[in-house]
Structures are given as C-alpha cells and as structure tokens.
Amino acid sequence: MRRVRAIVSGRVQGVSYRASTVDEARRLGLVGWVKNRVDGTVELEAEGAPDRVAALLAWCNDGPPHARVDRVAVEELAVTGTETAFSVTR
C-alpha cells in the first residue's frame, strides 16, 4: 500500500478538477480525499495499491479537459488504512 499527498497548481479550480479526481480515484479503487485550497491549488491524499496511486498521479498531471496543470508536488505519507472511500472534503 502507498499513500501520497499531492498539491496541484495551475488552472485547477472552477474546471471540475475535484469531481474528476474523485471519479478517477474511485475508478482506480483508491481511498482518500480532494479539496480546493485558498491559494488556488487543489490538494489531495490518495491511498491504495502503489501502481494505482501512480496512475492517479499521472492523471493529475493532465486533469480534466478544461484544466491547465502547471505542477504536481507529491509527498509520500504513512499509510493509514482508515478510509473506505474517496471524496471531496473541505
């Protein structure tokens, strides 16, 4: 298992980035959350099989059709094993 935190910069708010991230993470069978930050970035934590987490991070570099991703900063975290779904949080 692998858990990461990612901060996504660019035009990532107001373009369905969070909802699309939820869809992609659920499709990959991951758990965690995604939220908008006040600085205009999107933050997410995702946990699951290492190859599936890597697939989500690869997707994050493009995001949904109207997004423009400039940077995805990734931090490795300790696996928690406490979540059961992937959702939008505040």
Regions found by a protein language model. Name each.
Residues 1-90:
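Intrinsically disordered, low-complexity, mixed-charge
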